[in-house]
From Swiss-Prot:
Family named by the database record: Belongs to the cytochrome P450 family.
Top-level EC class: oxidoreductase
Record function comment: Exhibits a high coumarin 7-hydroxylase activity.
Keywords noted in UniProt: Endoplasmic reticulum, Heme, Iron, Membrane, Metal-binding, Microsome, Monooxygenase, Oxidoreductase
Subcellular location: Endoplasmic reticulum membrane; Microsome membrane
Main location: endoplasmic reticulum
Membrane topology reported for the UniProt record: Peripheral membrane protein
GO MF: metal ion binding; oxidoreductase activity, acting on paired donors, with incorporation or reduction of molecular oxygen, reduced flavin or flavoprotein as one donor, and incorporation of one atom of oxygen
Known cofactor(s): heme
Protein name: Cytochrome P450 2A7
EC number: 1.14.14.1
Swiss-Prot/TrEMBL catalytic activity: an organic molecule + reduced [NADPH--hemoprotein reductase] + O2 = an alcohol + oxidized [NADPH--hemoprotein reductase] + H2O + H(+)
GO CC term, one of those recorded: endoplasmic reticulum membrane
Amino acid sequence: MLASGLLLVALLACLTVMVL
């Protein structure tokens, strides 16, 4: 469960960087 959470955060960060 922790690994999927970290993966979700990494994906969110990637999207944020693309938007910025």
